[in-house]
Every structure is written in structure tokens, then in C-alpha cells.
């Protein structure tokens, strides 16, 4: 039986997929040339949102996945990875086997890790959140730069995975 037919909620299914992706990336690539990316991924605190994607403290709902700098209980800044379970289950894992779903999730996780590695959270923190058009433009520019690198790293066509550029659907 598949995860989707198990009767579990999308949040529980997404948790399973994300844990599997983290583990597969660590086993397959954690000790190789991708150790740099693995160390960033391991430092992220993943939080699966509810399906609405609404998170207190974030300006807009999380439709896919996103990273944000947040203060921990010890008042230390840490990077948090917010994951919408609907995106994982209905987009990344839809119509594919579990191995393909896992690879799709790894690609999106790496996309988010590269936002941190390229210091996008810090580099563009000065842009006021009320400058919506500018914020979206910067985000798309950052996404395009990241996706160009991702195709080199993963040897996969990024356009076949949805959610890596806001508002742009995957191609068939």
C-alpha cells in the first residue's frame, strides 16, 4: 500500500516523505562533494505547516517550501524550513513512485538550502516587506540563479518540478 492510501493525513504523509528525503540525501551524498549542502540541510529546522500554509510571523502563507530566519528559544537566530504538506503530497509526490517523489523533494530541499548558502535571507533583508513587487522580483531572480545551479548539481530538468519559481507551473 502507498503512503497516500494509508489513511494518514497529508501532514503525516509529508513528514514521512521529508524524513525519507533527508535520510536519502545524507546516505547518498552526505560524505561526498555535496557535504557542504548536506551540512546546511542538516542545520535546518523543518516545520510542516497545516495545509493553509499560514505561519505566525511570516508575511504570507507558505504555498510550497521556504526558509526563514527565526529566533530560537535561546534567542539565537536559526534557519527554519517551512513545508506545506499539500505541496509535498499533491505536487512533488503526485503521480510518481516513492523514489521519484523523494528525488523531487530533495531537489526542492536543495533549492531552499541554496537560498541560505547564497545568503539571500541576509543579502535582501533590507527590502521592506510592503514593497511587494520588488520582493517578488528579487525572489524570482534568486530562484532563477538557484535553479541554474541545481540543474548542474542534480543533473535533472528543474522545469519538470513545480514550485521552484512562484506562479510557474511544472512542464510535462
Regions found by a protein language model. Name each.
Residues 1-107, 113-172:
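Short, functionally important secondary-structure microenvironments
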Amino acid at each position: 500500500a502507498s503512503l497516500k492510501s494509508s489513511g494518514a493525513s497529508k501532514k503525516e504523509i509529508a513528514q514521512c516523505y521529508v524524513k525519507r528525503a533527508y535520510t536519502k540525501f545524507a546516505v547518498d551524498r552526505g560524505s561526498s562533494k555535496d557535504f557542504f549542502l548536506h551540512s546546511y540541510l542538516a542545520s535546518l529546522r523543518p516545520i510542516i505547516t497545516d495545509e493553509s500554509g499560514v505561519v505566525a510571523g511570516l508575511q504570507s502563507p507558505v504555498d510550497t517550501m521556504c526558509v526563514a530566519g527565526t529566533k530560537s528559544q535561546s534567542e539565537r537566530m536559526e534557519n527554519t524550513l517551512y513545508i506545506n504538506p499539500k505541496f509535498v503530497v499533491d505536487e512533488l509526490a503526485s503521480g510518481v513512485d516513492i523514489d521519484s517523489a523523494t528525488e523531487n523533494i530533495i531537489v526542492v530541499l536543495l533549492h531552499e538550502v541554496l537560498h541560505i548558502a547564497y545568503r539571500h535571507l541576509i543579502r535582501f533583508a533590507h527590502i521592506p516587506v510592503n514593497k511587494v513587487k520588488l520582493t517578488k522580483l528579487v525572489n524570482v531572480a534568486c530562484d532563477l540563479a538557484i535553479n541554474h545551479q541545481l540543474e548542474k548539481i542534480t543533473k535533472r530538468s528543474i522545469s519538470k518540478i513545480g514550485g521552484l519559481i512562484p506562479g510557474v507551473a511544472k512542464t510535462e
